[in-house]
UniProtKB/Swiss-Prot annotation:
It comes from the Bacteria. One of its GO terms (molecular function) is RNA binding. This is Small ribosomal subunit protein uS9. Keywords: Ribonucleoprotein, Ribosomal protein. Pfam families: Ribosomal_S9. Coiled coil: none annotated. The keyword Ribonucleoprotein applies.
Amino acid sequence: MSQAQYAGTGRRKNAVARVRLVPGTGKITVNKKDVEEYIPHADLRLVINQPFAVTSTVGSYDVFVNVIGGGYAGQSGAIRHGIARALLQVDPDFRDSLKRAGLLTRDSRKVERKKPGLKKARKASQFSKR
């Protein structure tokens, strides 16, 4: 007798998170570590829990995440996106509240590339008229 599993893939910046939701107690495991151990910043852990807060399902599902690429902020955003997509599979009625909170939209902002002749993406060396 296997439990129902719900999957979702989330992306943010260079991070990609594959998320599985299993009915349980609300335990979040990221790359086989506890979320408090893997993500040290409390504000980023709040970001991860946003989809549950919006849908009033806090503590209803255990979350297993495999995330690669990016840093803490990008990975947290990717996990949030993946959880929101997985919650859609749990109950399609969540779509309206998740969409209104902006959790289903892929944040397309990425690091702008460095241009030749400039020091960074937009920073130029100081201009001298004479």
